Amino acid sequence: MAAEASKTGPSRSSYQRMGRKSQPWGAAEIQCTRCGRRVSRSSGHHCELQCGHAFCELCLLMTEECTTIICPDCEVATAVNTRQRYYPMAGYIKEDSIMEKLQPKTIKNCSQDFKKTADQLTTGLERSASTDKTLLNSSAVMLDTNTAEEIDEALNTAHHSFEQLSIAGKALEHMQKQTIEERERVIEVVEKQFDQLLAFFDSRKKNLCEEFARTTDDYLSNLIKAKSYIEEKKNNLNAAMNIARALQLSPSLRTYCDLNQIIRTLQLTSDSELAQVSSPQLRNPPRLSVNCSEIICMFNNMGKIEFRDSTKCYPQENEIRQNVQKKYNNKKELSCYDTYPPLEKKKVDMSVLTSEAPPPPLQPETNDVHLEAKNFQPQKDVATASPKTIAVLPQMGSSPDVIIEEIIEDNVESSAELVFVSHVIDPCHFYIRKYSQIKDAKVLEKKVNEFCNRSSHLDPSDILELGARIFVSSIKNGMWCRGTITELIPIEGRNTRKPCSPTRLFVHEVALIQIFMVDFGNSEVLIVTGVVDTHVRPEHSAKQHIALNDLCLVLRKSEPYTEGLLKDIQPLAQPCSLKDIVPQNSNEGWEEEAKVEFLKMVNNKAVSMKVFREEDGVLIVDLQKPPPNKISSDMPVSLRDALVFMELAKFKSQSLRSHFEKNTTLHYHPPILPKEMTDVSVTVCHINSPGDFYLQLIEGLDILFLLKTIEEFYKSEDGENLEILCPVQDQACVAKFEDGIWYRAKVIGLPGHQEVEVKYVDFGNTAKITIKDVRKIKDEFLNAPEKAIKCKLAYIEPYKRTMQWSKEAKEKFEEKAQDKFMTCSVIKILEDNVLLVELFDSLGAPEMTTTSINDQLVKEGLASYEIGYILKDNSQKHIEVWDPSPEEIISNEVHNLNPVSAKSLPNENFQSLYNKELPVHICNVISPEKIYVQWLLTENLLNSLEEKMIAAYENSKWEPVKWENDMHCAVKIQDKNQWRRGQIIRMVTDTLVEVLLYDVGVELVVNVDCLRKLEENLKTMGRLSLECSLVDIRPAGGSDKWTATACDCLSLYLTGAVATIILQVDSEENNTTWPLPVKIFCRDEKGERVDVSKYLIKKGLALRERRINNLDNSHSLSEKSLEVPLEQEDSVVTNCIKTNFDPDKKTADIISEQKVSEFQEKILEPRTTRGYKPPAIPNMNVFEATVSCVGDDGTIFVVPKLSEFELIKMTNEIQSNLKCLGLLEPYFWKKGEACAVRGSDTLWYRGKVMEVVGGAVRVQYLDHGFTEKIPQCHLYPILLYPDIPQFCIPCQLHNTTPVGNVWQPDAIEVLQQLLSKRQVDIHIMELPKNPWEKLSIHLYFDGMSLSYFMAYYKYCTSEHTEEMLKEKPRSDHDKKYEEEQWEIRFEELLSAETDTPLLPPYLSSSLPSPGELYAVQVKHVVSPNEVYICLDSIETSNQSNQHSDTDDSGVSGESESESLDEALQRVNKKVEALPPLTDFRTEMPCLAEYDDGLWYRAKIVAIKEFNPLSILVQFVDYGSTAKLTLNRLCQIPSHLMRYPARAIKVLLAGFKPPLRDLGETRIPYCPKWSMEALWAMIDCLQGKQLYAVSMAPAPEQIVTLYDDEQHPVHMPLVEMGLADKDE
């Protein structure tokens, strides 16, 4: 309509006819229907159309070519006479005020075409000139006939016309200026947008170049790596060839060497691993792929500047649109660069870029400029806007526009989304909640809880209506939830139906209500208690239901206010159904097992939901495994497929299987194949037939290491965590074999019935197993390639060319090749990586030639040669003579080694082997510093030696021999029935000996019955194993001992492997050290050479230790620099500060220039750990001392009284003289290293490093004895007063053995409380052999022997008790001191507050007569055969009543039937009023507070401590004991004494401590039992109903305990070997 309006034009006659029709001068004003302006009817500047609507001229700007005017409101046409040229301009005289108000932008918006405006103005000028002429020609007549007023009126009209022309000229001038500015701005925007595109292309070009350069660099690095690998292999092969030539030159050496082993070594070091080197292939030439023609075509048509017409002008609406457009344009200018569609995915709609595009709807005019880039569609189709088409900008009016528009493809199926399954009815009816709505769910939960907790309960008169929204306290979901009432059942017999409202009930009339949880999907049934069962149907019982007395407590009615708050949160539960599956048995419906398995796979985890369609509000979906980069999940690839595989469902059409699994199935790397026409060493692992069998390459023990790791992992792993619910074809997995061991496998068949067919990829055999024996494979086990290579024998075919191999041929081939080491000659590599091979038996004697298995089958008539095959010539090859090699030297040295002096080897033995690569066999690994190796050439020697020893000792008889350390012997290995040479390390007991089998490097403990004297002729041969240690590494964690993890890892990695060692030259001495320092290299599973030391460092099990050669004396720093006396050290520091003062430097920096720098250099150099002098023991047998501390191991540290003053003096001098030590560089502390320690009290002490634990160091304060773990920054590696011996002396009690041979924690606690800071008398009994060892003493405190004291309380056992009982003679000073210290005051004992009533002991409970079975409860376990029991509650109550009848204690006021528990409850309520306990006699009854804060009956056992006072009490009703302070004891009310003590101490019959108990941890107070036995007994007694039978009467109660099945409770201990039967 706008286009049609733009084609109309104004005409003089039309305006004259319509504007002046029968309208006299001075008529009333009319109002424009469109803009509302009021125009005088006399002015003629209005148009009254035939339809009756009136418009001003400004609202009807028309061209001369138009013949009709279309009404903008009703669209009725009005004819116009274009031949008349009259155009009235007088009307502008009265409209000047309006024109002044029109802003330039408004004029511009109203104007549609500059040319049209100029034409209109020209017409106006012509009309004005014509009017002037008419006035001049008629002036004479007018003067005669008209008055002067008419002339003035005409002049006034002309004056206003002139002013109007001036205004129009100014408007044109402004439009010209605006147009120029607009052109410049549009050009600027276009340049900016295209500059962004150019920047994008430049960035893309850089990214392409960088990506190509990176890819090329990676490829070149692989080539360089392969090249270096080839050079290394060439060097290794050259060395091996030299060894072989040497053996040929010296035939005598063949008797001592295994020629087959040498040949196999040659093959292993060359051809067997070249396959890995040949993996880098020449890649395809790079090529840049750019669709230039399409891009150029798009650029040629990209962007268009349009001028769109508009005939309507709405100033207010236009202003709003401009503001919105401006915001949108600014946003798009920022995002245009990033959102530009990829060229390969977008297509441009050519119709948009040409003039053929249909005109857009009319919009207000604007000047904003944008780029237009619409997507291509096929040229045959016209681009249409789909619901998914998003226009980036709204369509514009007549203005230069450049539009960006993006078209999004409409997918057939929606993309996957993460969801949670909230409720499952069956696989075709379940509810989900979206993962993206988690925040909404939390907000909803918070709002609902706030409303429900704040609102009041329902009133019984409230009305409940079906379908109404309600809030309910959900049982299953555990929160307040939104719900919908789905069923209401009234109480029987009441008129519950309301008139005209059959679905409404009062709350008090409801018997049963069912509510559907709209946010979870489940339904819950609330049943009113007492309702007749007829109201409850089976479907109600199947759902979550609960019986309530009052429904008002769990229901809240929804209010309009709450609905308004929650209206934005739609129900979160979405009903879903799995696509295209039905129950396995359609007649019976879904089984419960299907729901259980469904929940098992999806419960409590996020899964990926793929939506296919929607039917009646239900989503048809499939639940799948989420993407790995989002959430780790055990979800199967497809839940539908899993249910079908488990035979719980079936497809409507069996062709509807998901193809998603093909892209997610894990696969192994294919096996590494040897090259054609090469020979490799193999083992045949599985045989189907001579034309179908599998072999493994012998590349080391990596396959064994892999298999062992897999077995250990899956044997200990929880099976359900890695269970495969739905296997797919060719899926990599781990499967259990019939031997119970887990191996790598892949799925090759799905026969159904919960079974899968798998192939073991490392062996080649197949098996059909259940799904329970299949597990997911870990990533680290997936990286290794398959080990089994499929092969077929070359040159031969089934006998007489039959189609299949005979059974005899298969059996014969298995007999010759199955599980044997063989040499394989690869003839050709067939399709599907099948090798065509010839097998040779390589286990013959050295002088025998190898035999071909292929030929043997033909000779035995089990196979035939292929047609055209030519027999080979088996002529003997030329024998070459090789040069001598290092191995020949090794063989000679093995014979020359002296086994007796193996730890002081002469230099010439290994001098020639230093820094050479020597092949060895790792026979035993104990730790990184103790590794036993054998030369590869000693295998024959070891076999020969074993034969000699069997001949010498097989029938020998044992004779008593007095064995001593370092004696040589012959040792029989019982489990292997072998004899080995050995050397005694130590005598463990009289019958057990620890020996070293030095030919194989094994240490073990054997019985002396297995030892024989070693004959002299068997000593002539040297040791066949060497002890080595890895260099350049040290234990991690700061300790000087290797961790068990490091030892186990190294043993698993090296034991039994063939490796290469390089003997390292000792940098300090020329003599050979022992163990031999070596570097060990071996091959990993990828065939790469690995340095074992670096391997341990990489695993974090070791740290690198530098080996730095000794510096010259001129460059070394004397260690005495670390021992500068502190006075001198302080002066040196002061001088440094004076002579090198620099205001810009800190003091520490100045010191470091001259002194600290040298100290730091000393730290980094190899250092010898130095320490302080050992303690000086007083030269007297008896001396006084102060106990400084008691160590955790029971060591008593004492400081002699005579040395205390010197210790205080030295400590003060250290604090006053030790100033600034500077900042310490990173320092590696060693165990035993002396240092200066800054303690927790900020004082400096002398110390010694005990252990390095992470970033902290455990140090010992040498002059005080105690240890502490402190940060490394509080240590400094200097010696303080190194000439002064250590002040504190470590001591141990003489001839005193603690329980369990080590001081137990409770004994350590007693020693610490008893001796800390106490003055004691020391009697020296035995001086230590090493001055750093403990001094053996007798210690007396206040005349009491410490050994006797500890033995009395059964913390230890001690000899010479009669000597210890003698008290030390006391002088008069001691007696005076004792009297002063023990001054007795008894005034306070007479006060009334301390009066304690005399109470009788507790009554004891009695057991039934012997032989009677009665129920008991075990209250406390002292040891496995000593417990406290009480009779069952009924019998206890009866006994309590019997005692209360006979009780004449005078206590009254309580009910005779009150039980003990009730009485204690009443006492606990007013325990604050009870008086404190003041009488601490043994067996004194009292009330004691237990750990639970309640008070129970107890009695005093002993006083444990005096400062503070601690009392040991026993709870008489339970048997347990506790050490309590005074505030936890009070006097017992007398009425509680009438109840007998419930706990009865009994001994258990039927078992006793075992004679041989290997448990290391003993019960401290009962060392004959182990802690393991105690815990096992507690497990047997806990949580069971027990019965007892008395075996012996009081005083020593002995009973036998039985469980509820009448079995003795101690039998599990006997079966576990923790106890022996007591007959």
UniProtKB/Swiss-Prot annotation:
Keyword Flavoprotein listed: no
Function: Seems to be involved in regulation of transcriptional activity of MYC. In vitro, inhibits DNA-binding activity of Mad-MAX heterodimers. Can recruit Mad transcriptional repressors (MXD1, MXD3, MXD4 and MXI1) to the cytoplasm. May be involved in spermiogenesis.
Localization, UniProt: Cytoplasm; Nucleus
Transmembrane feature ranges: none
Modified residues (N6-acetyllysine): 234
Zinc finger (RING-type): 32-75
GO annotations of cellular component type: cytoplasm; nucleus
SMART domains, sorted: TUDOR
Lineage: superkingdom: Eukaryota
Chief location: cytoplasm
Protein's UniProt name: RING finger protein 17
InterPro entries to which the protein is assigned, alphabetical: RNF17-like_TUDOR_rpt1 (IPR047845), RNF17-like_TUDOR_rpt2 (IPR047847), RNF17-like_TUDOR_rpt3 (IPR047848), RNF17-like_TUDOR_rpt4 (IPR047849), RNF17-like_TUDOR_rpt5 (IPR047850), SNase_OB-fold_sf (IPR035437), Tudor (IPR002999), Znf_RING (IPR001841)
Species: Homo sapiens (Human)
Keywords: Acetylation, Cytoplasm, Developmental protein, Differentiation, Metal-binding, Nucleus, Repeat, Spermatogenesis, Zinc, Zinc-finger
Subunit structure: Interacts with MXD1, MXD3, MXD4, MXI1 and PIWIL1. Self-associates.
Tissue: Testis specific.
GO MF annotation terms: identical protein binding; zinc ion binding
Segments of this protein annotated with the region Disordered: 1-22, 1438-1462
Domain Tudor positions: 726-784, 962-1021, 1228-1285, 1479-1539
PROSITE patterns membership: TUDOR, ZF_RING_1, ZF_RING_2
GO biological process: spermatid development
